Amino acid sequence: MKKTGLLLALCLLTTGAFAQADQSSPAGTVATNVNFPAEAIATPTQSDLYCAGFVNKSLLPNATYVAGGLDTPNTTQFSDGGELIYLAGKSYTLGQRYRVVRELKDPNRRELFNGQDAMLKVMGQPYADLAIVRVVDTRSRMAVAHIELSCAPILPGDIVADFAEKSPIAFHPSMKFDRFAPSNGKAGGRIVLAKDFDSELGTGMKVYMNLGSNQGIKVGDYFRAFRSYEADLHNPVDSLSFKASTAEDTQAKPPSIEKNMLTKSSGPTIHVADLPRRAVGEIVVLDVTPTTSTGMIVFAMEDMHLGDGVELDPQ
């Protein structure tokens, strides 16, 4: 009798759990750890906010720049907190903070996905955030400043720009991640570039996307990053897998993928456009311009790639 009562209780609990999962899932889905894994979202730090870099539609003025430091010319890189540097140009204000940035070029320039160069031309010029400095002396022809926050070594010639405080990104509690969510019709774009010109991306890394405040994007918004199999089909390297044989000797009617001529198929043709798009992670917006946004990857199911799609996530 006790065993019967225990089994009945377990059945009721199991039924209730499945019912609760079904109620919290979109129509046509069953929430499981496979297609709805829990995501723990990383919260951006002060360094993440001020060291992310950005892409700007127009070139920043370069009339104010770093000229050197206490040990110039013996020392050409300045990065220690409290280190003094000299700022060339005019209109520095004593006690004012400034932002040191660098206009970038990729020494190994090549397209990592079709159309990347054209998108970058529309987005503008990439810049690296190097440091926040505060002016402590303006009596000479050059201002003297000390480094308050260092992101990367400063070099002579790096640009000195105006500084603006950034609001912290609020903590986001853990939630369920829908791996196979179809398009929600919200604003979307692509990951076009990444900090340090990286191409294989994971949690904590910074990315630059081709949509901004003109599309209603604001700091603190979240994007769902996704990848379709059509992207692999059109990639000269990844597409090689689609051209390999998919047949197995015991299959009476083996299928082919996109009419692969290497597979003698009497079976069905699998069209990659019909495969579900897969979500690969979440990105939070750290900064925006009218046409671009800087984001930080806060959750990744797998490596993100340049060219991956992004879509505003209303969650």
Predicted regions and their residues:
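Surface-exposed, polar/charged interaction patches used for macromolecular assembly or partner binding
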Residues: K2-G5, F18-Q315
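Bacterial N-terminal signal peptides
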Residues: L7-T15
